From Swiss-Prot:
Record Pfam families: MinE
Signal sequence bounds: none
A Gene Ontology BP annotation from the UniProt entry: cell division
Gene3D superfamilies: Cell division topological specificity factor MinE
Organism annotation: Prochlorococcus marinus (strain SARG / CCMP1375 / SS120)
Protein name: Cell division topological specificity factor
Keywords: Cell cycle, Cell division
Family: Belongs to the MinE family.
Length: 106
């Protein structure tokens, strides 16, 4: 996702049909190069979302995992909107800080 894409999304602008077609073509090419089926990509998406959801609250409907190709390199890109951190993670950080403080005193 380019800076222009981010700004357009924030401004509520819809991408031009040519941009959508280009994105679809890049996705098809990336799938062909990696030999990943759409079913496998969806399974990976679900697993990635479930792992990330252990640590932060995410928007499952808006979460997207895609393949992007740039300069002959294909990347798996996860765009996961985070709603908030989970209280368990905060406790882990606090516990870690307490452990470090106790070690410093010893």
């Amino acid at each position: 996702m380019t800076l222009r894409d981010i700004l357009n999304k924030l401004m509520g602008r819809q991408p031009a049909s040519a941009a959508k077609a280009r994105e679809r073509l890049q996705l098809v090419l990336a799938h062909d190069r990696t030999d990943l089926s759409p079913d496998l990509l969806e399974q990976m998406r679900e697993e990635i979302l479930s792992v990330v959801a252990k640590y932060v609250e995410i928007d499952f409907e808006e979460g997207a995992v895609s393949l992007e190709t740039e300069d002959r390199m294909t990347a798996l890109v996860a765009n996961l909107p985070i709603k908030r951190t989970l209280s368990g993670e905060i406790k882990i950080k606090e516990q870690s800080s307490a452990d470090n403080s106790a070690k410093a005193v010893s």
